[in-house]
Curated annotation (Swiss-Prot):
This is Aspartate carbamoyltransferase catalytic subunit. Its EC number is 2.1.3.2. It catalyses: carbamoyl phosphate + L-aspartate = N-carbamoyl-L-aspartate + phosphate + H(+). The gene is pyrB. Catalyzes the condensation of carbamoyl phosphate and aspartate to form carbamoyl aspartate and inorganic phosphate, the committed step in the de novo pyrimidine nucleotide biosynthesis pathway.
């Protein structure tokens, strides 16, 4: 997908009142939409960063449909749904009827007939979640848990919540560096879109040319490209390290992993170029000794494990808000008391 195409707004995910009914992509959502997600997620965390259970989805059924492997995302969605008192079903795609030749459309229609309220979908095809929400199951709340190289909106929102909680600064005042495989990363696309929407004016993308997407220069005035990592991270408030997406690379993009670490690996020496209170993030899974050194991943400036906790809160928020938006759309309720 040409990166400029991601700026086309998608109103499929909003109901007639402008509230979330699906969560498919950051693009097309306003600052107010994103802030509502962050504020709702914040309400599920106490002052000590402990999660707060609320039975907002009691009697509702959430189905996790992961057509790609996942550990953190699937598990945190399950944890989020259970903390909202939902019934959770994890569909084993490898053993489902899709492996027997059934179409995706027929599989989803059958699952919808089982009284599913929310589908959490991860798929290797870009646009899969949008297709399901628009053309297959519009009355089921569809949450995009990652579609190809396109988008990973809940990861972006948990990253934004982590940045907001840990830096205690306005997004307008932050310098954020994203380092690694930008070309194949749905996280990078969604993070950049969320940062732009929330007002960040200094977004630095650091990568070799072979790991940058076509059309990068069209992404926005506040996004700058750096091939030199030392230059790119100097004075940053936030560093987000990304792994190399080997499973999505068709032809060799690097001479070796050791060469990537030498040029772009985050170590103590490089981190010292950022601000003293710079936080270090990573969406996982990490490849230690490739994009990040263990001393940094496990160090005092790392907030990687806090991202995981924040991910549950964000996914609780997205599940609750999307269910509310669907019920509003269908004229069944005015609002859930969030």
């Amino acid at each position: 997908m040409h990166i400029a195409a991601l700026h086309q707004p998608s109103q499929v995910q909003l109901n007639q009142d402008g509230n979330l009914k699906h969560f498919l992509t950051i693009e097309g959502l306003s600052k107010e939409n994103l802030t509502k997600i962050l504020d709702t997620a914040q309400s599920f965390l106490d002052d000590n960063n402990n999660l707060i259970n609320r039975p907002l989805l009691e009697g509702r059924t959430v189905m996790n449909l992961f057509f790609e492997n996942s550990t953190r995302t699937r598990t945190t969605f399950e944890a989020a749904a259970k903390r909202l008192s939902a019934n959770v079903l994890n569909i084993d795609i490898a053993r489902s009827s899709t492996s027997k030749g059934e179409t995706l459309r027929d599989t989803l229609w059958n699952l919808e007939a089982m009284a599913a309220d929310i589908f959490v979908v991860r798929h290797s095809s870009s646009g899969a979640a949008h297709f399901i929400a628009k053309d297959v199951c519009p009355k089921v709340a569809i949450i995009n848990a990652g579609d190809g190289r396109h988008a990973h909106p809940t990861q972006a929102m948990l990253d934004m919540l982590t940045i907001r909680r840990e830096t205690k600064k306005s997004f307008e005042d932050l310098s954020v560096a994203i380092i690694g495989d930008i070309k194949h990363s749905r996280v990078a696309r969604s993070d950049v879109a969320a940062l732009q929407t929330l007002g960040c004016k200094d977004i630095r993308v650091i990568a070799p040319n072979t790991l940058l997407p076509v059309g990068f220069s069209e992404y926005g005035d506040h996004v700058r490209l750096f091939n030199n990592m030392d230059e790119g991270i100097t004075g940053c408030d936030v560093i987000i390290a990304l792994r190399i997406q080997n499973e999505r690379i068709d032809s060799p993009a690097l001479s070796s992993q050791s060469e990537f670490y030498r040029m772009y690996g985050l170590n103590k020496e490089r981190l010292s170029l950022a601000k003293p209170d710079c936080i270090v993030m990573h969406p996982g899974p990490m490849n230690r000794g490739v994009e990040i050194d263990s001393s940094i991943a496990d160090g005092e400036q790392s907030v990687i494990l806090k991202q995981v906790t924040n991910g549950i809160a964000v996914r609780m928020a997205v599940l609750a808000l999307s269910m509310q938006g669907q019920l509003q759309e269908q004229g069944l309720i005015e609002a859930i008391a969030l």
